[in-house]
Every structure is written in C-alpha cells, then in structure tokens.
C-alpha cells in the first residue's frame, strides 16, 4: 500500500537530482546566449529538466485526520482519486498550443492552494451558482425587451433616461442606484407585507393597508433544486452561453487579421498605426475633447443605436451588411490596402547569424618536452577562468575534436560553413579581458604566464564557426516578393572582417564583407568569411601541422 500511495503523492520524485550539463561554445559577445554545445561520449546531449507544469501535491499532514492522528481511509481514497485524475489529465491532454504552455504553468501555480479537480466539487459549485443566477438573467431579459421594442413606451422612457444620464452624468449615476433600491426593492416589499385592499376601479391598488404587517417579510434566498426557477436558470444558462461564444469568435475573427503576426508586414503596419493613435490619444485627447461637443454626439449615437435596434430597421441593416455586394466591397478595399502595404513593406530583416568561439587547449609535458592536445572547450582555461578558479579539470569539460561540437540550442550550423582558425588572437584576448597570457604572433598560440613571468603549462588558440537561427516550425515560408536585408540599426555592431583560415586548408587571409556578399552572412561580431570559396580538400598541409612544426623548431 505504501508503494501505491507513494506513486500518487510523490509528484516531484527525483526532481532534485543534479543534471549533467553539456559544454557550449562561447560566442563573441556575452549579451547573446549563443554558446555552442560540445559533446563527447560521456557527456549527455541535453540535461534533464523537471516538468515545470508539475506542481507539488499537498502532504498528508495537511489533510483532515481521524482520531489517532492518521488520515482516515475515506480521505486517503479521495486524495488518491483526485491525484490520479490530475496525473491522467497531465499525461493524456497536451496543451492546445506552444504559446499556451507558459499560461498553463502560471495558472497551475496560481491554483496550487485551491482544491484539485473533483466531480463532487464541480457539481456542488454548479448547483450553488445556478440557484443564484435569477437576477443576471432577469437583467438580460430586460435588455432584450428594451432593444426589441416589445413595449415602445418603455423603450422610449429608457431613451429619455439615457439622455438624462448624458446631460447630468454625476447626479444621475450617483442617484439611480439609490432610487432603484428605494422604489424597486423596498417599496414592493412594503406593499407585500402591507397588502393593499382590492378595488374594482384599479387592477393594482398601490395604497398599502394601514396598521401592522399582514404578512411575514420574504428575504430572497437561493432557489431549491426542485423548483421552476432552478430549471429556468438552467435553461437560460444553456441558451445564453452562445452569446459569449459568438462574441469570442467575432473578436478573434477581427484580431487574427492583424494582431497575431500571421502576416508580418500587415501586422507591423497596424502596430505602427495603433501606436501612433494611442500616443496621440494619451498626449492630446484632453485638449482635443474640448473641441468636440461630446454630449450631443453621445446622445445622437445612443438614439441612433436604439432606433437601429428596432426589429424592422435591424432586419434591413443586417441584410445589408450580410449581402454579397457589401462583402465584395469590403474584400476589395481590404485587398487593395494589403497590396499597398506589402508593396511598401516588402523588406524583411535577414536571418540571424552568430559567431561561435571554441578554444583548442594544449598542455606542456616537461618529461617529454612537447605540447600534448587536451581538447576543445568553450572555456579559454586561462589563470582566471571559471574552470581554473573552481579547480575543475579541463579534460572533463572538453571534447577531442571539433566535429563533436554542436550548435547552441535553437541554432544550426550555416550551410557549407567550416571551422576557422582565428589569426588575430590579440583581438579576442583584449575583448575577453584575459590577463597573464603571452601571445605568440607567429604560431597564433596564447600561452599562460605565471605570476613569476614564466610560461605556464597551458596554451590555447581560438576556432570560430557561424550558425544561423533554426526554424522551429517546418511550415514557415516567406511570402512572394519579400527581400531580406540587414537591419541598418544593427549594422554598426558588426565587424567588417575575420582574419583566419579554415581547418585542413592554408587558403585564407583577411576576408572582408562586400556589396556582393549575402546579407545573411552578417554575424554579431563581424562578417563570416566566405567559406564557399575555400577549398577544404586542398593538397596543402594543414595549419595545425604547420604551427606545431614551427613551435617545435622554436
């Protein structure tokens, strides 16, 4: 029994187990999370994370206990049933969309202290709510009666009342609730307990009987389940649900045309227009409102709405709005507007490119008097690097070859890209503020310098590669006529050249960006060399062999 209850109660089992992190390539700038993942056989490709939507379940100590301090059998069964239903929902019912995952997580965190999903609680709460829905449905019936002109005199009276509210808003809005309480609640109740005498001259005698009360006062209570009011509330709830459904669908139909960036050009245009309107409204509406006679305008709009809601006028307007002619005119106007927007906003920002940095680490062995390769790491392993400060072995945080390095999460290597050896180590040493190192300008190695000024036992050099942002959805396609361009506001942050050669080739040098280069070959710290023009299979010896030979000679 203990193992069964642990299955239901221990919702965060093994959640605190430490995960194994992967090595990541360091990017040129720390502001962008673009570190490349470096993997080897003993390192997992991704760390395991606990499910963020899984909340902790209440412990048994928080449940009602029977005499003796232990939970009763009925409480245990109820707890297990509720937890089982919750777990089944989590496993079997996925989120409706990817954007809803965060919303679901926040809602689950907010509802952590609330009761779990239960059929009994749902049924009880629904019955309690339905027994108290009489007043809202009566108000809705009155509104429908007014707009349908069931009693024209009543509707005209409401129109005059609306006019009076517009003319004297503060007096009317502060007095109407009090008048309603006096003449719609208290007076009918007084007439009920002081029942008027019937008369043959009037249908309803409004003169209360004199003397003490003739009836007991009736205080409104929730209607019982077996009553006509309860059934009427249930029927009205069933029918009025469609009002919210239609309102929701109509609102979504309007917003999906521009608010969700289904077409970036159209949504960008509406965003700019709405931003300008909101800004002008915030800054100048108090001055602009003085130039408009608001009260006559509101009165005309209100009376026009009431007149348009008359059954005969409403039928004519709805027929006109839903006609094929109106639909074609609206479609023509919207199509012309969208075509003009697409014509002027056909330029889109180029796909993001980033430069990934990896350091090749070598260690000097005095007994052999030679440098032995250690591996490739995202850490430069200098004297003040994080690995050296925490006394971690570089062998455990590196891989043996560049081919084992993976791009950062949600990124992918650029097509036909190669690893490039950086031939200007002074630049990245200064950019990363690396201290106590010595730069060999001939071999391009950066050596450790001990505090006494002697060379240390480690050296490193930097390799770079370019990656592009991965498309998370395969169905994304660019619209016809769109042109990718580099954002001019970000162009200043790009470096104009990378000094390096590709792995396995001596063809290299200082490569610069030109007008003929593709716009998407811009990186965060410069233009990636045009690796398509570099012969990776050339017959020259590799740069690694050359630098090692020079170093041995020195």
UniProtKB/Swiss-Prot annotation:
State which ranges are Cytoplasmic (membrane side).
Answer: 1-145, 194-264, 309-554
**Residue stretches spanning the membrane:** 146-166, 173-193, 265-285, 288-308
Q: Does the keyword Mitochondrion apply?
A: no
Biased composition annotated in UniProt, kind: Low complexity: 55-64
Quote the PANTHER family the UniProt record gives: PEROXISOMAL MEMBRANE PROTEIN PEX29 (PTHR28304:SF2)
Q: What is its main location?
A: membrane
Function in brief: Involved in the regulation of peroxisome number, size and distribution.
| Disordered as annotated region, ranges | 11-73, 500-532
- UniProt-recorded name of the protein: Peroxisomal membrane protein PEX29
What is any one of the record's Gene Ontology cellular component terms?
A: peroxisomal membrane
Biased-composition ranges, Polar residues, are 11-22, 43-53
Q: Does the keyword Transport apply?
A: no
The family annotation for this protein states:
Belongs to the PEX28-32 family. PEX29 subfamily.
Tell me which InterPro entries the record gives.
Peroxisomal_Membrane_PEX28-32 (IPR052816), TECPR1-like_DysF (IPR010482)
Q: Which UniProt keywords apply?
A: Membrane, Peroxisome, Peroxisome biogenesis, Transmembrane, Transmembrane helix
Its membrane topology: Multi-pass membrane protein
Q: Name one Pfam family in it.
A: Pex24p
Print the miscellaneous field. Present with 5040 molecules/cell.
Domain of life, per UniProt, equals Eukaryota
């Amino acid at each position: 029994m203990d193992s069964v209850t642990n299955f239901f109660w221990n919702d965060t089992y093994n959640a605190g187990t430490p995960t194994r992190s992967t090595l990541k390539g360091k990017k040129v700038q720390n502001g962008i999370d673009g570190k490349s993942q470096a993997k080897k056989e003993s390192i997992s490709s991704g760390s395991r994370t606990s499910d963020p939507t899984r909340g902790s379940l209440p412990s048994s100590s928080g449940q009602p206990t029977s005499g003796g301090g232990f939970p009763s059998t009925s409480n245990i069964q109820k707890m297990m049933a509720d937890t089982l239903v919750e777990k089944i929902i989590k496993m079997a019912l996925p989120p409706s969309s990817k954007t809803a995952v965060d919303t679901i997580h926040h809602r689950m965190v907010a509802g952590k202290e609330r009761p779990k999903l239960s059929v009994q609680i749902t049924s009880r709460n629904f019955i309690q709510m339905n027994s108290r829905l009489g007043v809202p449905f009566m108000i809705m019936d009155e509104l429908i009666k007014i707009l349908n002109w069931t009693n024209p005199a009543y509707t005209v009276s409401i129109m005059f009342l609306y006019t009076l509210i517009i003319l004297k808003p503060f007096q009317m809005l502060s007095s109407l609730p009090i008048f309603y309480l006096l003449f719609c609640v208290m007076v009918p109740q007084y007439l009920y307990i002081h029942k008027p005498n019937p008369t043959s001259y009037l249908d309803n005698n409004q003169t209360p009987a004199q003397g003490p009360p003739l009836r007991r006062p009736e205080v409104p209570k929730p209607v019982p389940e077996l009553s006509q009011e309860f059934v009427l509330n249930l029927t009205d709830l069933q029918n009025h649900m469609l009002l919210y459904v239609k309102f929701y669908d109509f609102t979504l139909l309007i917003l999906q045309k521009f608010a969700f960036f289904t077409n970036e050009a159209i949504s960008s245009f509406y965003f700019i227009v709405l931003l300008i309107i909101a800004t002008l409204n915030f800054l100048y509406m108090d001055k602009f409102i003085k130039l408009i006679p608001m009260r006559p305008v509101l009165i005309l709009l209100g009376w026009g709405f009431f007149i348009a809601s008359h059954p005969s006028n409403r039928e004519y307007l709805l027929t006109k709005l839903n006609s094929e002619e109106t639909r074609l005119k609206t479609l023509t106007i919207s199509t012309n507007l969208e075509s003009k927007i697409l014509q002027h906003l056909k330029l889109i920002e180029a796909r993001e490119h980033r430069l990934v940095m990896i350091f090749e680490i070598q260690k000097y062995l005095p007994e052999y008097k030679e440098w032995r390769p250690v591996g490739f790491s995202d850490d430069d392993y200098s004297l003040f690097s994080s690995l050296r400060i925490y006394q971690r072995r570089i062998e455990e945080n590196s891989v043996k070859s560049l081919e084992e390095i993976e791009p950062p999460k949600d990124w992918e290597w650029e097509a036909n890209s190669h690893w490039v050896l950086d031939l200007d180590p002074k630049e990245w040493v200064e950019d990363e503020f690396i201290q106590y190192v010595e730069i060999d300008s001939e071999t391009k190695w950066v050596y450790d310098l001990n505090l006494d000024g002697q060379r240390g036992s480690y050296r490193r050099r930097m390799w770079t590669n370019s990656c592009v942002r991965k498309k998370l959805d395969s169905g994304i396609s660019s619209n016809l006529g769109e042109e990718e361009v580099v954002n001019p506001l970000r162009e200043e942050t790009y470096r104009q050249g990378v000094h390096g050669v590709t792995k396995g080739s001596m063809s290299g040098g200082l490569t610069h960006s030109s007008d003929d280069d593709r716009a998407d070959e811009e990186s965060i710290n410069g233009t990636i060399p045009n690796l398509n023009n570099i012969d990776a299979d050339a017959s020259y010896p590799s740069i690694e062999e050359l630098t090692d030979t020079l170093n041995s000679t020195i």
